Structures are given as C-alpha cells and as structure tokens.
From Swiss-Prot:
Protein name per UniProt: Ribosomal RNA large subunit methyltransferase E
A GO term from the CC aspect: cytoplasm
Protein family per UniProt: Belongs to the class I-like SAM-binding methyltransferase superfamily. RNA methyltransferase RlmE family.
Swiss-Prot/TrEMBL catalytic activity: uridine(2552) in 23S rRNA + S-adenosyl-L-methionine = 2'-O-methyluridine(2552) in 23S rRNA + S-adenosyl-L-homocysteine + H(+)
Main location: cytoplasm
UniProt xrefs under Gene3D superfamilies: Vaccinia Virus protein VP39
EC number in record: 2.1.1.166
Entry keyword annotation includes Amino-acid biosynthesis: no
Record function comment: Specifically methylates the uridine in position 2552 of 23S rRNA at the 2'-O position of the ribose in the fully assembled 50S ribosomal subunit.
One Pfam family named in its UniProt record: FtsJ
Active site per the UniProt annotation: K206 (proton acceptor)
Amino acid sequence: MSSAEGPKSGGGSKGSKSEASSRVRGSAPTGSRDLFVRVRTAKGRKASSTRWLQRQLNDPYVLEAKRQGLRSRAAFKLIELDERFTLLKPGMRVVDLGAAPGGWTQIAVERTRSLHPNGGKVVGMDILEWEGVAGATCLTHDFMDDAAPLMLKGAMDGAVDLVLSDMAAPTTGHRQTDHLRVMGLAEAAWYFAEEVLAPGGAFVCKVFQGGTEGALLTRMKKMCEVIRHAKPPASRQGSPEVYVIAQGFRGLSGGEDTGRDES
C-alpha cells in the first residue's frame, strides 16, 4: 500500500528568485492561489476525473510540492506534524511504511540528515515497485511478511527510533468500509512497530475516524507514554483522516494502561 496522496513526481517550475530565496525546501505553502483554474470535461473523461484534475490544479500544496521537488503533497503533512511534535531529529533511524511515491521518505532523509556523515538512517518500504530516494534504503517488500521486521533491523543495524505510516487503501466511497480498511492497515503497522521500535521510540499513523479505533488505542496506551491525535493543515477539507502520534515506547512489558491520551 502506498501513501494516499498519489504518484506525483518532483520537478515543476522554479519560481521567482525572491520566492525561492524566501522559503527553504520542505516548508509549507504560504498564501493561496489568486487565479482559479477551471477544467472542462473532455470527451471520454469522466466527470469525477475532471473534478480531480481541477482540484489538483488549484491545490497550493500540490503546486508547492512540484516547486520544491517533493513527490507528493502528503509530504507537507509530515512537515506539519514534525513541526508540532518534534518527531524527526538528525541521527535518527526511521522507517516509512507504504512509502511510495516517496514524499514522506524525502522529508525523513532531510530532517535526519541521512545523506551526511554520522547522520541518520532511513528505510522506505512498500509492496509496490517505486523509485528510490537518495539517502534512504528503499525496499520493495510487504511489511506484513513475517520476515519483514528482521529484514528492517538488518538494514538499520538495530532497532528503529520512529515508524511512519501514511498508508490508506483505495477508497470505496462507503465511509465505514473505508474506515475499516484503513484501520486494518493501521493495526498491522502498529504490530510491526512493536517488533522494531527501540525504547523511547515513536509511531505516527494515519487512521480514518469511524469508531473502531478504540481497541488499537488501548493497546498503544499500554506500551507508550503519551498518545496524541492531530489533523495537519495539509489534510484536505472533508477528509476523515487523522493522525495518531504515539511517543515514549515502552514495549510489550509496558503493563497496565498508563499512557496519557492528550488528544
């Protein structure tokens, strides 16, 4: 499974010199687009495809992702979560599950400085074939496979400081069905995290609101110091997605439900 914010490649216009100098790569867009681009329905194109294209052309996060060479607008969600919760630090070991097309992996590489000597280590893993990201070990493998945790620890030379998951199954339009499918991925990602996280580690995962997340949160509270929920500004309006941030991993020996829920 891959990040829900579609296969957008890097590139795009360079923008003006003043604009380029006023922002660092990885910063969120400021302001809004002045002109609205309206797309006509072409012959053979479905109305839903036209609406999607029009939304993309008028989305400041899509435009800014292209300008900065980021592979998806979803990268800004991780940027905003990191700025709020201080998730990524130089030298950290990070795994990005469902990494394709690589937007979150790009941000993890930059903020852990994995391209630098003595920097961090980043592994991106996805069941789909995907283009690698410089500074990361990019694996095409199903993280639900029994051998995946051992494979990851081998690539990391040890346990992990942060597990990221922006995975979402293709939506059906039926809210409860979509909720259950995303929660299945979230639960699988958490069970994977239990096997690879180092003490004190953290976990970030997308869920869809829908009422069945209680059992997972209860389990997480037994193993982490604090659980938070957040909806970053880059999440689209009307989207049911929210992110669970678990910090202070204690492991399977955590015992009773002592974690704080600071939603």
